[in-house]
């Protein structure tokens, strides 16, 4: 069986998001979902923003300035509600008949605060569409469940493979459509 779900994992800063973005650029089909990018103020990282692959819309997900946020991961306050519109795009894509790749960057602690996140991710894994996602490396009940699915291939991004992965992944995704 060909694994239709691809999970990229690896150390922070190794290039998982870069692999996602380059893979999406190589695809001839459309992609629906989002990727996450660091927000920097000078050199230090002060937060993360989420960017829609469909519309280019950008919203902050977590920031050191979100001091009153109830949800927190380390020094970052999390605005989980900012992810809701991006989840809606993925849910709508799963009801269409359009050939496409679903993209979720990232399945991790900050995103878990968003109502409906677990359900949308689970539906994406069960859908007929190829899924390309990044996932936290550390053990977590939901993440371990996803990593151990029979229809999922977990690939660790390293300095040795990160430059070659986008072309290989794009070819594999195109073959599934």
From Swiss-Prot:
Species per Swiss-Prot/TrEMBL record: Natranaerobius thermophilus (strain ATCC BAA-1301 / DSM 18059 / JW/NM-WN-LF)
SUPFAM superfamilies from the UniProt entry: P-loop containing nucleoside triphosphate hydrolases
Pfam families xrefs: NTPase_1
HAMAP family tied to this protein: NTPase_1
EC number, as in UniProt: 3.6.1.15
Keyword S-adenosyl-L-methionine attributed: no
Name assigned to this protein: Nucleoside-triphosphatase THEP1
Keywords linked to the UniProt accession: ATP-binding, Hydrolase, Nucleotide-binding
Protein purpose: Has nucleotide phosphatase activity towards ATP, GTP, CTP, TTP and UTP. May hydrolyze nucleoside diphosphates with lower efficiency.
Class in the EC hierarchy, top level: hydrolase
Domain of life: Bacteria
NCBIfam families noted in UniProt: PRK13695.1
Sequence similarity: Belongs to the THEP1 NTPase family.
PANTHER family the record matches: CANCER-RELATED NUCLEOSIDE-TRIPHOSPHATASE
GO MF annotation: an example: ribonucleoside triphosphate phosphatase activity
Lineage, highest ranks first: Bacteria, Bacillati, Bacillota, Clostridia, Natranaerobiales
Positions with a binding annotation for ATP: 10-17, 101-108
Reactions this protein catalyses: a ribonucleoside 5'-triphosphate + H2O = a ribonucleoside 5'-diphosphate + phosphate + H(+)
């Amino acid at each position: 069986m060909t694994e239709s779900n691809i999970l990229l994992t690896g150390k922070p800063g190794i290039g998982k998001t870069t692999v996602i973005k380059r893979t999406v650029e190589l695809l001839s089909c459309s992609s629906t979902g989002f990727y996450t990018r660091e927000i920097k103020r000078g050199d230090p990282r002060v937060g993360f923003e989420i960017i829609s692959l469909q519309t280019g819309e950008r919203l902050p997900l977590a920031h050191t300035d979100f001091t009153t946020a109830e949800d927190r991961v380390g020094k970052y306050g999390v605005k989980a509600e900012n992810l809701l519109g991006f989840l809606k795009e993925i849910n709508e894509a799963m009801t269409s008949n359009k050939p496409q790749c679903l993209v979720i960057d990232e399945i991790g602690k900050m995103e878990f605060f968003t109502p409906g996140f677990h359900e949308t991710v689970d539906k994406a894994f069960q859908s007929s569409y190829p899924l390309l996602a990044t996932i936290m490396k550390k053990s977590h009940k939901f993440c371990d469940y996803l990593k151990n699915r029979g229809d999922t291939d977990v690939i660790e991004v390293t300095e040795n493979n990160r430059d070659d992965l986008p072309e290989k992944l794009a070819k594999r995704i195109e073959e599934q459509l």
